[in-house]
Amino acid sequence: MSQRIFLPDTLANWQWPRHLNPHYAEVKKASAAWAKSFRAFQTKAQEAFDRCDFNLLASFAYPLADEARLRSGCDLMNLFFVIDEYSDVATEEEVRAQKDIVMDAIRNTEKPRPAGEWIGGEVSRQFWDLAKKTASTQAQKRFIDTFDEYLESVVQQAADRNNSHVRGIESYLEVRRNTIGAKPSFALLEFDMQLPDEVINHPVIKELENSCIDMLCLGNDVVSYNLEQARDDDGHNIVTIAMNELRTDVAGAMIWVDEYHKQLESRFMENFKKVPRWGGPIDLQVARYCDGLGNWVRANDQWSFESERYFGKKGPEIIQRRWITLMPKMVSEELGPQIVDGSHL
């Protein structure tokens, strides 16, 4: 008999509601066409990529953005998942080379990419060439710095995978906090802001970011576990990590994740109430930024069930009943995402 899994409703009491950017449909059309133009995947994988609708994720994550900044968000989410799909099947050395290509492309957008280079370089160059036009100087710097950190952690993830290295909970979260790509995503929240370093680096703001990132990590790992175990790629997932360290099963790991998530929620809300005031217009920007962090947690969860990334067409049903069936192993020779057959869930 197939094993059933209960997905904890980690956001049952989260105060940020579902909020979709009104420019979603129009901007999605442009960004999806842009992403598809690179032909990064074969036909079937491209269809699966389209069904994932990473533009929906951006439109939940940046509900107040104007069309230009939403386009940057959509393009970034598409770029993230191009990098993700290629790095997931690459060696540490190959991922290191991919990182070098991407960072060179972002730091030198005026430089044409070499013929025959990995496609991620040109995707990155075009993304940043457009996105930086809508970003403040501080936000540009923070994006580049945090994107470099993100890519370095993806290299580390590849090293762990190649060496079959299974981390403990704390060690895993140290790496996962960067591989999830939250920090560069947060930089987009401040594209139209002028937040000084002393504000963005304030301990309370950092604590808010850290709690938000950990909730994103846990939430994403809960919904992605089934697909990742089916692809035999669940070594970099908190459910697997908790099962190994706590010597428990999937159900036990899910309970642990739910309890830890509640602690993170409390920590976030405590710090949300402690955000200091600097005076003047900066306080309005800080309030928007912190609200954006809270919204990101809801955005990631909502997209996980409304797109077809993890549950095929059954997401809206599963978000209500929470029970799913452990999927059978999936083997694909084709690079890129795979279409999820909801009949297995």
Swiss-Prot record:
<comment type="subunit">
    <text>Monomer.</text>
</comment>
<keyword id="KW-0456">Lyase</keyword>
<feature type="binding site">
    <location>
        <position position="84"/>
    </location>
    <ligand>
        <name>Mg(2+) 2</name>
    </ligand>
</feature>
<keyword id="KW-0479">Metal-binding</keyword>
<protein>
    <recommendedName>
        <fullName>Delta(6)-protoilludene synthase</fullName>
        <ecNumber>4.2.3.135</ecNumber>
    </recommendedName>
</protein>
<feature type="binding site">
    <location>
        <position position="220"/>
    </location>
    <ligand>
        <name>Mg(2+) 3</name>
    </ligand>
</feature>
<keyword id="KW-0843">Virulence</keyword>
<dbReference type="GO" id="GO:0010333">
    <property type="term" value="F:terpene synthase activity"/>
</dbReference>
<feature type="binding site">
    <location>
        <position position="224"/>
    </location>
    <ligand>
        <name>Mg(2+) 3</name>
    </ligand>
</feature>
<keyword id="KW-0460">Magnesium</keyword>
<feature type="binding site">
    <location>
        <position position="310"/>
    </location>
    <ligand>
        <name>(2E,6E)-farnesyl diphosphate</name>
    </ligand>
</feature>
<dbReference type="GO" id="GO:0000287">
    <property type="term" value="F:magnesium ion binding"/>
</dbReference>
<dbReference type="InterPro" id="IPR034686">
    <property type="entry name" value="Terpene_cyclase-like_2"/>
</dbReference>
<feature type="binding site">
    <location>
        <position position="84"/>
    </location>
    <ligand>
        <name>Mg(2+) 1</name>
    </ligand>
</feature>
<dbReference type="Pfam" id="PF19086">
    <property type="entry name" value="Terpene_syn_C_2"/>
</dbReference>
<feature type="binding site">
    <location>
        <position position="228"/>
    </location>
    <ligand>
        <name>Mg(2+) 3</name>
    </ligand>
</feature>
<comment type="function">
    <text>Delta(6)-protoilludene synthase, part of the gene cluster that mediates the biosynthesis of melleolides, a range of antifungal and phytotoxic polyketide derivatives composed of an orsellinic acid (OA) moiety esterified to various sesquiterpene alcohols. The first step in melleolides biosynthesis is performed by the delta(6)-protoilludene synthase PRO1 which catalyzes the cyclization of farnesyl diphosphate to protoilludene. The orsellinic acid synthase armB produces OA by condensing acetyl-CoA with 3 malonyl-CoA units in a three-round chain elongation reaction folowed by a C2-C7 ring closure.</text>
</comment>
<feature type="binding site">
    <location>
        <position position="309"/>
    </location>
    <ligand>
        <name>(2E,6E)-farnesyl diphosphate</name>
    </ligand>
</feature>
<dbReference type="GO" id="GO:0016114">
    <property type="term" value="P:terpenoid biosynthetic process"/>
</dbReference>
<feature type="short sequence motif" description="DDXXD motif">
    <location>
        <begin position="84"/>
        <end position="88"/>
    </location>
</feature>
<comment type="pathway">
    <text>Secondary metabolite biosynthesis.</text>
</comment>
<comment type="similarity">
    <text>Belongs to the terpene synthase family.</text>
</comment>
<dbReference type="InterPro" id="IPR008949">
    <property type="entry name" value="Isoprenoid_synthase_dom_sf"/>
</dbReference>
